């Protein structure tokens, strides 16, 4: 399978925007999940069962946070690379025109 490299800075920034939307969606859903877990806690749960449930939810919340951080990392990398590509392209054009 041939690799395709994205070299259009505008497309790279558009793709970065998509990663931001995905990150926001994951973050929103994780927040709702955590709120739901907090609402359930104490409603018939007690002792070890409640503690285990909250611990599991905390671990899942951290996993979602890690996903959000990775999505933000990809977003930031795309924006950075788009900026670098444009700068290098401009420098190359200046060299060729002189």
From Swiss-Prot:
Transmembrane regions listed in the UniProt entry: none
Entry keywords, A to Z: Secreted
Subcellular compartments: Secreted
Keyword Secreted found: yes
InterPro entries, A to Z: ESAT-6-like_sf, T7SS_ESAT-6-like
GO cellular component, one term: extracellular region
Principal place of residence: secreted
Induction behaviour: Differentially expressed under different growth conditions. Highly expressed in sputum bacteria.
Disruption-associated phenotype: EsxKL deletion mutant shows reduced intracellular growth in primary human macrophages. Also shows growth defects in the absence of host cells.
Description of how the protein assembles with itself and partners: Strongly interacts with EsxL to form a heterodimeric complex under reducing conditions. The complex is regulated by the redox state of EsxL.
Family named by the database record: Belongs to the WXG100 family. CFP-10 subfamily.
Record-given protein name: ESAT-6-like protein EsxK
Organism in which the protein naturally occurs: Mycobacterium tuberculosis (strain ATCC 25618 / H37Rv)
């Amino acid at each position: 399978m041939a690799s395709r490299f994205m070299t259009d800075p505008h497309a790279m920034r558009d793709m970065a925007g998509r990663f931001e939307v995905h990150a926001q969606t994951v973050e929103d859903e994780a927040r709702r999940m955590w709120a739901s877990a907090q609402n359930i806690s104490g409603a018939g749960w007690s002792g070890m069962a409640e503690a285990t449930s909250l611990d599991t939810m905390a671990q899942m919340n951290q996993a979602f946070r890690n996903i959000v951080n990775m999505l933000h990392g990809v977003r930031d990398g795309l924006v950075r690379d788009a900026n670098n590509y444009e700068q290098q392209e401009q420098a190359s054009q200046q060299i060729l025109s002189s």
